[in-house]
Amino acid sequence: METKLLRTPLYELYDQAGAKTVDFGGWELPVSFSGIKKEHHAVRNAAGLFDVSHMGELLVEGPDALNNLQALVTNDLSKLQDNQAQYNAMCTESGGTVDDLIVYRRNENAYLLVLNAANIQSDIEWIRAHVSGQVTLTDISNETALLAVQGPKALAVLQTLTDEPLSEIRPFRFKENVMFAAIPVLASRTGYTGEDGFELYVKAGDAAELWRAILAAGEPFGLLPCGLGARDTLRFEARLPLYGQELTKDISPIEAGIGFAVKTDKQAAFIGQQALKKQKEQGPSRKLVGIEMVDRGIPRTGYRVFYQGQDVGFVTSGTQSPTLGKNVGLVLAKADAAAIDTELEVEVRGKRLRARVVKTPFYKRTK
């Protein structure tokens, strides 16, 4: 029997727009509207609008919310103020990654966790199995839609729809009940593209109206609706990990290069702390590195990588970078094959093609 794909509240809108949809973790989502490269360049140069409503939202509330979360996540939530967000990971005892997530502090007893779509149920089960005391978990994923407006002109586009001075919401800060075109929104200065921008959490029933308002407001600025294809090439160029590729139960946050989100010295003990502390102190045995192809070919997820004839790892993500026009990839490689300018080989369809280790991120926006 065929499993029915899940749809976001905006499905009808992108169906009408002629978007090409794909199965993404059980969701029927647009891969592109007008073309991946066109959408990618719109975000790098102007702005793009994404439907990210497949992401999960979990409220964690109560007097014991903070202590419970501190024991689950790798970053230090005690450093957060109200209306501040923080990038985080949850790990197993051995240091593998359960998921990467954003934690929003609404107040000292109320947090919003944003989870990867494919992991919503397993994450909630993991959290539920590890919390105790006065804490409640409320899954609000189905009633919450999430739109992302990203790019150098994102703020200007959104400012036309609200009286709220959006420039006052600093990166990784958020404000609740901001009115955009008379729709109440939680507006967060976060994103997954390497550009400035906002993520807008809204009631599912208001999502279509907000989408239309942003598209109309963005037209004079060159804003385009964007699909998963551009979202992936954008995050890849900025070296932002994708769960299931750069991060898995077998790959730690340290190996994946997000050690900044792992505070092994925070006062609260957390799951995976000892394993991650050891990796930080001794250096991980594997590292995520960037490669650029020397020979012609595109490194794709799962391709094996060789150094001096030895298998040293695999490609986690790879593509022809729309911004650079080069064939580049991210590789989880043994540490002794990870130095910049190291010559590697990628096995592409049975042939070993030359590549070299390069600095990442492949793209960094100028402030």
From Swiss-Prot:
UniProt entry keywords in alphabetical sequence: Aminotransferase, Transferase
Reactions mediated catalytically: N(6)-[(R)-S(8)-aminomethyldihydrolipoyl]-L-lysyl-[protein] + (6S)-5,6,7,8-tetrahydrofolate = N(6)-[(R)-dihydrolipoyl]-L-lysyl-[protein] + (6R)-5,10-methylene-5,6,7,8-tetrahydrofolate + NH4(+)
GO terms of biological process kind: glycine decarboxylation via glycine cleavage system
One GO cellular component term: glycine cleavage complex
Alphabetized GO MF terms: aminomethyltransferase activity; transaminase activity
Domain of life: Bacteria
SUPFAM superfamilies hit by this protein: Aminomethyltransferase beta-barrel domain (SSF101790), Folate-binding domain (SSF103025)
EC number: 2.1.2.10
Family annotation (InterPro entries): GCS_T, GCS_T_bac, GCST_C, GCV_T_N, GcvT/YgfZ/DmdA, GcvT/YgfZ_C, TrmE/GcvT_dom1
Assembly information from the UniProt record: The glycine cleavage system is composed of four proteins: P, T, L and H.
Family named by the database record: Belongs to the GcvT family.
Function, in words: The glycine cleavage system catalyzes the degradation of glycine.
Protein name: Aminomethyltransferase
Gene: gcvT
